[in-house]
């Protein structure tokens, strides 16, 4: 039985991770949650008022208590305390992206398996370093792009494989959402914010899934809005060795869109919520041939649960761990390739 602890009482941990974890309790159970100590939160506390420290501790400990009240387990005062606990086998890490490398590295060095929210880190070198440590210590490292485990992806694959829309001419993947609160970490450069690492990562991963291992980023564009220090929207083109193209668009100051369009020689598939379908959501897609549109409905699924179960597989099986390392490095490489393509086009 794997005992997993959570670093940081975050919203996604309470709303999504814990309900899914409860369904997997025959394989993995909740051990407890750590909230940041003053030193972990502020760094040097010598210039921080006692009132600010007290408010931070009360706020974070109160959040942690909501987990314990609902699910049991133990509260750890400090991320270090959780990571160093002998009662914990694995760590779930839902911190902002810029903090992933530091705390995932520390967890791995302390012999803990790591289940990290996407992106694994903010750069290829850091992801590579985490994989090196995990591999040396025989530990699982899993990045939570849960959408790839949803049954709707295979269902749409099957429609294409049956030839219902003929030969694929183009994939178009779009993921964007309206502007969030100004203090959201996504808009904070120091915390690893930016549309590429957030919405953009989804589109790159799904395009790679559709195009296969020969897919390459050939063009990339990111765009800024004056009042923000991070990129707010962007686009890319990916092509595989067969010449099939995927056009990607993403943003976090956009009208909401989360869809794939697969344009074939005989028809077109469109599906919504392809990257973000929550538990209980009933996926729908359409097949359009000329002016005729056929609606289709698929069963609901729980991709977060499946992502947790994939992590469990990696904990228990070396071959699965190695496969997962390759998945992580591929995603980090695609993000790096995107950045290189953008920089290359802007340096001409």
What is the meaning of each model-derived region?
Residues 89-90, 96-97, 101-148:
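Beta-strand-loop-alpha-helix segment that lines the small-molecule cofactor/substrate pocket
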